[in-house]
Amino acid sequence: FWIGRTKGVPVYEKLSYPLLLLSFFSLTQDWNQAYININYVGEFSNGFVPFLNSTFLTSLLCVALVGFINLLHYSKKYDRPWPAQKDLFHLISYGISGIFLVVLYGTFATEISNYWDQLLISTPVYNADLKIFKAIWLLNYSLLFMTALSFLNIIRLKNNTLAILSITLNILVLFAFLTVGLYGLSELRESYLGEGQLVPNEPGFYNISIRYISFLFVAMLLFVSYKYIKQAYVSVAA
């Protein structure tokens, strides 16, 4: 892609797009394989090291490469290979931007998921609370991710299409928290107050305190969503 765009060789850039798709699907396969290795193969039976494993490092490399492609693609310094085909340009723009966001989100979501999965299977006595913690922290991460994306668009990008997309996703994430999240938090509270605290792996105060962490993330997303609808460039009809 870099050669095609910066050196003005359109055929190279066109060839890079199927390679980008292939790399994306290969990465999703790596994520799936990491899940299998933890839950069925027991690859990390001696302990999973968050953010210091081959899957995470590979994902970071993909984030950097796809991010670099996006920077070149949106740079006005270089001409695109099909200047007259605006619809095709927009389609490609949505595609590579979407891939970047999915890879960026999935890189850390996979790490969070794998951490809690490994913790669950490594405990000598089954602890159902760990599955709930996994769901809650994936929701917390989603809330934080959407807050950061929305804030970046408000102060820097100011893109209407991204604004409509992120507002929609903000609503979906908040709905997920109000349904799955609140139910999970209530289950953790019941586990802390109930008979479960009399058995090994007894619930601790973290079962209660995590709700305040989640509420903070919810408040942040609500605030940035409110700021969104006040932006002049945000329009459904645009």
Language model features with spans:
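Alpha-helical transmembrane segments of multi-pass membrane proteins
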Residues: 1-238
